[in-house]
Swiss-Prot record:
The gene is baiG. InterPro entries: MFS, MFS_dom, MFS_trans_sf. It comes from the Bacteria. This is Bile acid transporter. GO terms for biological process: bile acid and bile salt transport; bile acid catabolic process; lipid catabolic process. Pathway: Lipid metabolism; bile acid degradation. It is a multi-pass membrane protein.
Length: 477
């Protein structure tokens, strides 16, 4: 991999790190937004899935596009543009008055996120010496996960004291501060802007269409019906979009999706495992919040503290487990971290109506610790060998699959839990059980079923990890 000789690369990384801090901190603040909004609007809790997916669709699908744009316009311009869009989305979130309005606002927030994250990773790939990129990605993961440690707790406290709209205006103020910092601290360079004439616009449009539908399809199936017209139509459009996307990208001179980069084993295998396991974090975070809403409706803070513990675990996993893979075989380290992930999920089976913050925190904390280690290792492996010319599109492509794995988990596991609760409430109520008792029993039964399904996914993930090639030894040979 070629790197740029920059003696001030660590100092130059500071504003990019602050931008990453902004995204993760506000992500933590808004972890409690979905359930609060649907409760405020008086609509079903399963609508939290759509709020999460709206942001996830744009942040994932637009990542390779805006990463590619960074290769064309330059990092500084793209980063500042991303912060502006990110701030605008949060302003719209603060004034949202309906579900449709909120979905549009979160979609815009996701576009801003998609412009910021690939640029930060591209800086690491191109400016840091090759022998220090592992530590740099560990630092990036620490910033990304560590910042949201205080986010859910602070967000919950602000929301409890003043409401979710005030919480969002605090987020907007943070965006303004970070924009000013980045504007004055990132120096204009001699970067030569490339012409937009050869920009892969058809590929960009098809990427958004396919991957947005890819995220929505599981929710369509579970909420509307697997044999419904909407599900069949969405699946058909997605397949057609995928076929056309492959054809377009094969012919494009400068494709959004770099086929050579994606075809490597170092990319394919980690992505498959990410889809099986990494989505558990966001899904379980949402499900714990909803579980507490069902079983302890007057307790706003308990789930926020538990989520903060999860991000502490993720931060520790990224800096403790992740770097171990530089010395030991990655698949051995990954197996260990996935076992920890399984333990975290298994603890959900013990959730009860009167469970304390301790068991919620233990479950999410251990889960975060295991997944934090995985994420760091996968990032170092998948992004190896990128040249500076395609750093933006490469990191954006990886970011697409990394980011889409989490909301894909949300699209599968959150409706599975929420719809399970709804079905069980109806079943227990029809048997003569009082509504409150039926709701609590339904939530416990559904979380236990969900636990068994998630453990099955982790087992498959471990099997795939054991099939990984001896990655680092192979590179040394």
């Amino acid at each position: 991999m070629s790197t740029v000789a920059n003696p001030n690369y660590k100092k130059g990384f500071v504003p990019f790190a602050i931008a990453a801090l902004l995204v993760s901190l506000i992500g933590g603040f808004t972890a409690v937004l979905g359930p609060a909004f649907v409760a405020d609007q008086g609509i079903d809790y399963n609508n939290t899935t759509w709020i999460s997916l709206a942001l996830a669709m744009s942040s994932a699908a637009c990542a390779p596009i805006l990463g590619k744009l960074g290769d064309v316009l330059g990092r500084r311009t793209t980063l500042l543009l991303g912060i502006v869009i990110f701030a605008a989305g949060n302003v719209l979130t603060a004034v949202a008055t309906s579900l449709i309005f909120m979905l549009a606002a979160r979609f815009i927030v996701g576009i801003g996120t998609a412009a910021i994250s690939p640029i930060v990773m591209a800086y690491i790939v191109t400016e840091y010496p090759q022998e220090e990129t592992g530590k740099a990605f560990g630092l990036y993961m620490l910033i990304s996960s560590g910042a949201v440690v205080v986010g859910p707790t602070c967000g919950g406290l602000i929301m409890n004291a003043a409401g979710w709209r005030v919480m969002m205006w605090v987020c907007v103020a943070l965006c303004v501060v970070v924009f000013l910092i980045c504007t004055f601290s990132i120096k204009k360079t001699a970067f030569e802007k490339k012409s937009m004439a050869g920009f892969d616009k058809p590929g960009a449009a098809l990427v958004v269409v396919f991957f947005s539908l890819f995220l929505c399809i599981p929710s369509f199936g579970q909420n509307i019906g697997w044999s419904s017209t909407a599900f069949i139509a969405a699946a058909a459009v997605a397949l057609v979009a995928l076929f056309i996307l492959v054809m377009v990208e094969k012919k494009a001179k400068s494709p959004i999706m770099n086929g050579k980069f994606m075809a490597r084993k170092e990319f394919v295998l980690p992505v498959l495992i990410l889809f099986l396991t990494q989505g558990l974090m966001m899904a379980n975070m949402t499900n714990v919040i909803v579980f507490v809403r069902y079983t302890q409706p007057d307790n706003v803070i308990i789930s926020s503290f538990a989520i903060s513990i999860m991000y502490i675990g993720m931060s520790l996993g990224s800096v403790i487990i992740g770097p171990v893979a530089d010395k030991k075989e990655p698949k051995t380290v990954l197996t260990f971290s996935l076992v920890l992930t399984a333990i975290g999920c298994a603890l959900m089976y013990l959730f009860k109506a009167d469970s304390s913050v301790a068991i919620f925190a233990a479950s999410l904390g251990i889960l975060g610790f295991g997944l934090g280690g995985n994420a760091t290792i996968f990032m170092k492996v998948a992004l190896s060998g990128l040249s500076s010319e395609v750093a933006g599109s490469g990191t954006g492509t990886y970011g697409l699959f990394r980011d889409i794995s989490a909301p894909f988990g949300v699209a599968v596991f959150v409706p599975m839990f929420a719809n399970g609760v709804t079905a069980n409430i109806a079943k227990y109520a029809s048997g003569g059980m009082e509504e409150g008792a039926a709701t609590v029993k339904a939530a416990i039964s559904s979380i236990q079923t969900l636990t068994l399904v998630e453990l099955g996914c982790i087992v498959v993930g471990i099997i795939l990890v054991r099939m990984l090639p001896r990655i680092y030894q192979k590179k040394e040979a």
